[in-house]
């Protein structure tokens, strides 16, 4: 049986990246919540832009 998690960086960025979060009101709420909590890494995009948690 095939496993459910088949990793792909492209799909990961497209679904959970910064631009995708900014595209919807709820996505912006997610970012605001993560900023308020003091998260070092807001989205998966940050991993590729030098933040690396």
Curated annotation (Swiss-Prot):
InterPro entries: Ribosomal_bL34, Ribosomal_bL34_CS. This is Large ribosomal subunit protein bL34. The gene is rpmH. GO terms for molecular function: structural constituent of ribosome. Residues 1-20, 32-53 are annotated as: Disordered. The keyword Ribosomal protein applies. Keywords: Ribonucleoprotein, Ribosomal protein. One of its GO terms (cellular component) is ribonucleoprotein complex. It comes from Bacteroides fragilis (strain ATCC 25285 / DSM 2151 / CCUG 4856 / JCM 11019 / LMG 10263 / NCTC 9343 / Onslow / VPI 2553 / EN-2). The keyword Transcription does not apply. It holds the Pfam family Ribosomal_L34. GO terms for biological process: translation. Belongs to the bacterial ribosomal protein bL34 family. HAMAP family: Ribosomal_bL34 (MF_00391). Residues 1-16, 32-42 have a biased composition (Basic residues).
